[in-house]
Structure formats: structure tokens, C-alpha cells
């Protein structure tokens, strides 16, 4: 496994997670989970939480949600996709129930206001375009 030097990252005091455990559980999730990439090249999202008992909250456009981007040379921001009430995303997706992600999610939820939480999978040498997400 590749090791990463995190010396230039900001460390949140009193908050430590085991990256190796996350990676191990991620590998299990990736083996079992088919992720949806709704018509977007080089974008794969695996939702970690959902609206309680609403499977549609983690499919289609709900995976991406509304964002703003500069789409052309006018320099004006335009909104794309659908509005999502991030505050409703409070239930862990069942695939993550028996993983270390649950412990991390619960710890973060106690300290911070969370909206949708998802894993974004990016192919090597690919990036997301400049964009701005709505604030919770």
C-alpha cells in the first residue's frame, strides 16, 4: 500500500481516524457496490448517507445535486442540476453500516453539521471542473 505524507495538511485537534481501516473497508465496498455515474465522464460517486428510507435520494441527479459553474467564456456562473435539501441526509446507507465509515460518520456528525456525504472516485489524471457547491 502506498503511504502518503500529510505534513502539509491541516490537522483538526482531537480528531484522528485510521486511514488503513478506511482503505480496507473502502476496498470491500468497491468490490460489492456498483456506483452510478449519471452521464458524467470520469465521475463516480458512492453515497454514504441518504434521506431516511428514500432510496431515490441516492440515485440519478441526487448523486450530484445542484452546483454552479462557469460554463462558457462569458464568465457568468450558471446553476446546474437539481436542488437538494442536504439537511435531510441523516441515515447511513446500509452498505456502510458494518464498516469503519460508520464510526467516522457518527464521530463527525457529533462535531459538525453534515449534509450529503459521499465518496468521489476519480480516474488518474482527471479532475472536476471548477465549480461551487451550495452551502448547507
Regions inferred by a protein language model and the residue ranges of each:
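Non-heme Fe(II)/2-oxoglutarate
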Residues: 1-106
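A short, contiguous structural element within a folded domain that forms the immediate neighborhood
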Residues: 107-111, 116-119
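Conserved short histidine dyad/triad with adjacent acidic residue
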Residues: 118-135
